[in-house]
Amino acid sequence: MKITNVRINQLVGEGKVKALVSVVFDGVLTVTDLKVVEGSKGLFVSMPSRKNKDGKFRDVVYPCTAEMRQAIQNAVLGAYDAMTRSGVAPQAGGLQGAEEPTAVEPAPQLQDESELPWEPGDDGEGARELAAVAGAVAAD
């Protein structure tokens, strides 16, 4: 699966969430509402999430391999960095980046979610930081 486009859809001026982003895979699948977040160790990419009945945020879409997570992180942060350095604000449809597709090896087929190396919906590093600010973005 290749990342064929990254769109910075909205810059968020205040708080830890810096941008809302869409990523296109193989030119046929778009995942929206990724967030560029300022964490204690720098910028990271948070996957789209929803608040469950317990008040915890769970990822709606998440990569099944560390390689795909890293490819998404690199593509999104690269597009965000290019946009912030250029000083160009996103236009309608977003600022496009990641023009060179990023190849990622296909993940092995999993029988069920119990085989995942993490809990589904666990955004890992930065999830707790994001939970504090995600409600403010969701309210917009």
Curated annotation (Swiss-Prot):
Keywords: Cell cycle, Cell division, Septation
First and last residue of the signal peptide: none
Region called Disordered, residue ranges: 88-127
Matches recorded under HAMAP family: SpoVG (MF_00819)
Family per similarity comment: Belongs to the SpoVG family.
Name listed for the protein in its UniProt record: Putative septation protein SpoVG
Bias-annotated ranges (Acidic residues): 112-124
Pfam families from the UniProt entry: SpoVG (PF04026)
Chain's role: Could be involved in septation.
GO BP term (any one): division septum assembly
Domain of life: Bacteria
Origin species: Symbiobacterium thermophilum (strain DSM 24528 / JCM 14929 / IAM 14863 / T)
